[in-house]
């Protein structure tokens, strides 16, 4: 029934009655339906999320207001006025953690709005606490800054571009636009770790267009709008949307574990930080075991195996 069809009352009274009926409908529907109505009203013109992970990469706990919450595939898509959860992008996976007591399963960004996929509904308008998984965040920062160090060195020494980058669950792959020998990669690895030991700062800036035009920086594609520039020591200047450590020493170490020809260039697999350390521990334990079986010193096991093969 439309309020204009009611007879015997003024137009103002009709409108007031209609609003009362509408309010009564709204307060009696389920919380999830209310969320849906809120989203339908807010989707057009929702303000960009304030990105706390850009303001402070070490921020792991924050409070923010829930702007929307919509059911999606058995979970809930939540937006906030601000967030420290990094969304997947630029080769870097999304953060994980907890939001208002619900687990954060995924985070992505669309048109400047960061959307969190969580396991339980959150009430619109409520202030909630977010807790980012710090171990995962540090791991991703170590891998990403380590990649910048290696890519910067390769670009400076050989002129090759980084044309592909991905942080996987086990390792990191970087695709370079030209061939690299094992000896060249060994030199790159040594130089990369030297940069880490110098512990130079990692700086982040948003240059004005006039400054950007004068800046020599790496970028995989043409960019528009505000450009975020990450400078790693004196080895790399790159347009980047990812999270990074504050100083190179926090990367810990870099190990290039393998390389193969790929699309006319070279795909390098690498490990940084805790991943490099854990890989070293596993391989050292295996080397110790082989050393014991061969009754040979750990750095002489290859020669011992060769003697066995020659017998």
Residues of each region from the PLM?
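Intrinsically disordered, low-complexity N-terminal regions enriched in serine/proline/glycine
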Residues: 2, 10-11, 25, 52
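Short, positively charged and aromatic/hydrophobic N-terminal segments
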Residues: 2-5, 23-38
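Acidic, Ala/Val/Gly-enriched low-complexity intrinsically disordered segments
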Residues: 9-16, 20, 27, 40-43
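Acidic/proline-rich low-complexity IDRs
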Residues: 14-22, 36, 51, 66
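Intrinsic disorder/low-structure terminal segments
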Residues: 17, 24, 34-37, 84, ...
